[in-house]
C-alpha cells in the first residue's frame, strides 16, 4: 500500500470523519466515504458501514479504506479537481490522461474542464456510470478552515436500486451538513 504526502498531511481527517460517517449512514441508509487526491487517483481514507454490512466489514461497490480509483472517472475525484486553480488543473491534465473506464467517461480535456467548472458552480458532483456501469456516484467537497478543498465526501448507489433524484433527495443536504461539520473540525 502506498502512503502519500497527501494522506500523511491529512492523517487526522479519518479519525474525525469516521464517527460522523456512521451517523450519516444511519440517517441516509447508504454507505459513504471520504477520499483525498493522490496524484491521478483518489484514495479512500474513511468509510461508513451500514448495519447490515457491519458484521462482515464488507462494503458494497468496493468502497474500503485504501481503495484507489482514477480521479477523473468518479464524482469524488471530480469534486476535488473542480476546486483546483486553472493552472494547477492544466498541469494535472498534462500529467494524467483522461483514460476511458466506461463509454460514459469524459475523455476530452475541454469538455472535462467545462464539467469541472459546472461542478464548482453547483457545489456538488454527480457521476452516472462514468467509473463503472450501473453505478451512480454523488459527492460534495470538504474544505479546511482556510477554504481549500482537502477531500471529497461521497456515496455510491446502484442505478438499479436508486434513481439520480432519489440519491440527490436522500443525500445532498445531509452530506453538505456533514462537510460543514468537518470544516469546523479541520
Where are these regions (language model features)?
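Short, basic/aromatic recognition patches
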Residues: 16-24, 93-139, 177, 185
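Amphipathic alpha-helical effector-binding/dimerization core
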Residues: 5-94
Amino acid at each position: 500500500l502506498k502512503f502519500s504526502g497527501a494522506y500523511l498531511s491529512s492523517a487526522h481527517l479519518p479519525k474525525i470523519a469516521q464517527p460522523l460517517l456512521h451517523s450519516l449512514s444511519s440517517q441516509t441508509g447508504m454507505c459513504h466515504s471520504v477520499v483525498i487526491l493522490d496524484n491521478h487517483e483518489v484514495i479512500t481514507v474513511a468509510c461508513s458501514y451500514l448495519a447490515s454490512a457491519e458484521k462482515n466489514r464488507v462494503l458494497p461497490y468496493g468502497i474500503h479504506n485504501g481503495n484507489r480509483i482514477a480521479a477523473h472517472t468518479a464524482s469524488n475525484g471530480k469534486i476535488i479537481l473542480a476546486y483546483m486553480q486553472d493552472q494547477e488543473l492544466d498541469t494535472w491534465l498534462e500529467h494524467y490522461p483522461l483514460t476511458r473506464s466506461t463509454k460514459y467517461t469524459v475523455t476530452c480535456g475541454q469538455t472535462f474542464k467545462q464539467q469541472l467548472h459546472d461542478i464548482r458552480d453547483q457545489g456538488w458532483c454527480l457521476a452516472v456510470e462514468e467509473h463503472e456501469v450501473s453505478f451512480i456516484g454523488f459527492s460534495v467537497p470538504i474544505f479546511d478552515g482556510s477554504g481549500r478543498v482537502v477531500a471529497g465526501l461521497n456515496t455510491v448507489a446502484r442505478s438499479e436500486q436508486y434513481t439520480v433524484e432519489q440519491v440527490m433527495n436522500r443525500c445532498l443536504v445531509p452530506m453538505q451538513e456533514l462537510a460543514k461539520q468537518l470544516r469546523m473540525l479541520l
